[in-house]
Amino acid sequence: MAAGTSIGTTPGGSTSPETPPEHGLTGTVISVDAMGGDTGPAAVVGGLAIAAEKNPDIAFLLHGDATELTALVAKRRALDGRVAIRGTSDVVTMHDKPSQVMRGGKDTSMWSAIDAVRNGEATVCVSCGNTGALMALSMVRLRKVPGINRPAIACLWPSRAKSGFNVMLDVGADIKADAQDLLQYALMGASYARNGLGNPTPRIGLLNVGTEEHKGRAELKAAHDLIAQAAPDNDFEFVGFVEGGDIPSDKVDVIVTDGFTGNVALKTAEGTAALIRDFLTQAFEKTPWSKIAAMLAYTSLRRLSKRIDPRRVNGGVFLGLNGTVVKSHGSADATGVAAAIKLAFILAQSGFTERLAARVASAGRARASGAATPEEEAVSGSANG
């Protein structure tokens, strides 16, 4: 963790949910960790300005070096009257271990941003910072929704679906997942698809090395059966096992996997998209004729570039917590930050966290009211909002 400036326009520190400090903001308030990303606070403030220009109902509680942030915000007319700055004296770097942050991170912008959600000052937290530290702090400060074993990170994946995106989880919260964890991921992913993408009956697929039911590890086969049993009562359709090539397809809406596999798939896709853009650029710049062809195809190429631009789907959502946290890429520029803010606003407007928690509580009561088998308990005690 690195030292910074502690001057701020609003007081920091921990506050009880009953008496949150007044930040004077109206509309949907998003708590933003301005520090810790690879591109610095200028990109974060730039993203806030883009989001503010497109959405008059959004406001920001910004956490970090107050002197630097005040100067950056003052340059953005779109942010006039829509930002309150919470000064902090420390920053979580990409090299900090989660255990270090847990022991000595109370004065960091990340801790302050999460606590704003915990204290009811903001609906959603957005951060470009250290993923491990952000998940650890989120779990400790916000706590898991009762009934959830492991939180997950869900991302939007460009696809052939009508919405243009599929949901994939877990993409990095936990490298391990047993059958009941995968069941809970399916239920949380279905809830995300309903509330984030407006899909009332999402189709769930379990990522495997093949679509045949006899393939895969034992926990995948067990998860297959649990998810299939849960589908009729939880408003989703289970399409069974899917392969890597199905992730961007229109045959599935939510892809469920463990965090190790999901993270590798995500990083591979991002690298492949960058490679395709580089190849196209090289091809159209090779000869005078190819440059002319590029000019003639400019509109189509621009449309393609936008479709595969990873900045458009920037923002992984932490699912299974008593509060919504959106993790932006550490290298996100202003466009990427704006995309994460847009996603945060959509989830805030949908009441996603409350819906998920209410469904889990309802399932828990149903489980407690009758004698259930272990498999039935796994199904009824999971999130299905």
Curated annotation (Swiss-Prot):
The main location is: cytoplasm
**Which controlled-vocabulary keywords does the entry list?**
Cytoplasm, Lipid biosynthesis, Lipid metabolism, Phospholipid biosynthesis, Phospholipid metabolism, Transferase
Documented EC number(s):
2.3.1.274
Q: Where is this region: Disordered?
A: 1-28
Q: Which reaction does it catalyse?
A: a fatty acyl-[ACP] + phosphate = an acyl phosphate + holo-[ACP]
Report the record's Gene Ontology biological process terms.
fatty acid biosynthetic process; phospholipid biosynthetic process
Recorded GO molecular functions are:
phosphate:acyl-[acyl carrier protein] acyltransferase activity
Q: Which Gene3D superfamilies match?
A: Isopropylmalate Dehydrogenase
| Top-level EC class | transferase
Give the CC-aspect GO terms.
cytoplasm
Compartment(s) where it occurs, according to its Swiss-Prot or TrEMBL record: Cytoplasm
Q: Which domain of life is it from?
A: Bacteria
Where composition is biased (Low complexity), the residues are 1-17
The pathway it acts in is:
Lipid metabolism; phospholipid metabolism
- PANTHER family (alphabetical): FATTY ACID/PHOSPHOLIPID SYNTHESIS PROTEIN PLSX, PHOSPHATE ACYLTRANSFERASE
**Family indicated by similarity:** Belongs to the PlsX family.
Role noted for this protein: Catalyzes the reversible formation of acyl-phosphate (acyl-PO(4)) from acyl-[acyl-carrier-protein] (acyl-ACP). This enzyme utilizes acyl-ACP as fatty acyl donor, but not acyl-CoA.
Q: What binding partners and quaternary form does the record give?
A: Homodimer. Probably interacts with PlsY.
Q: Name the chain's protein.
A: Phosphate acyltransferase
